[in-house]
């Protein structure tokens, strides 16, 4: 099977760089599956799990993204995520606590800046929890 190069980066770090046979991203209108030689595309992605099928590996690489942009070219995909964390690095207790803290901050927000920051923190926590949920369902 042919492959494409995938880059997933956040503002803080490069999260994934390598070849992939297939990628599924949480698109604005639902999941978006991309194979090599896909037509060029630029789209927004929403919070959720990004799934990358790596050649020669039985398990997909899972990355929680809190939103961002994805550029698709026939032989490459670049995901520019607001925040991204590899699924195997997510701490469930921390993500649950972050979600509760963000919900509380959203309720207490007094201006647009505080509201935007709380919404971004909530998106990040929800994306991590969705990725963990996907990983659990995949195992069972």
UniProtKB/Swiss-Prot annotation:
It is a peripheral membrane protein. One of its GO terms (molecular function) is proton-transporting ATP synthase activity, rotational mechanism. SUPFAM superfamilies: Epsilon subunit of F1F0-ATP synthase C-terminal domain, Epsilon subunit of F1F0-ATP synthase N-terminal domain. Its main location: membrane. InterPro entries: ATP_F1_dsu/esu_C_sf, ATP_synth_F1_dsu/esu, ATP_synth_F1_dsu/esu_N, ATP_synth_F1_esu_C, ATPsynth_dsu/esu_N. Keywords: ATP synthesis, Cell inner membrane, Cell membrane, CF(1), Hydrogen ion transport, Ion transport, Membrane, Transport. It is found in: Cell inner membrane. It comes from the Bacteria. Pfam families: ATP-synt_DE, ATP-synt_DE_N. One of its GO terms (cellular component) is proton-transporting ATP synthase complex. Produces ATP from ADP in the presence of a proton gradient across the membrane. PANTHER family: ATP SYNTHASE DELTA/EPSILON CHAIN (PTHR13822), ATP SYNTHASE EPSILON CHAIN, CHLOROPLASTIC (PTHR13822:SF10). F-type ATPases have 2 components, CF(1) - the catalytic core - and CF(0) - the membrane proton channel. CF(1) has five subunits: alpha(3), beta(3), gamma(1), delta(1), epsilon(1). CF(0) has three main subunits: a, b and c. Belongs to the ATPase epsilon chain family. This is ATP synthase epsilon chain. The gene is atpC.
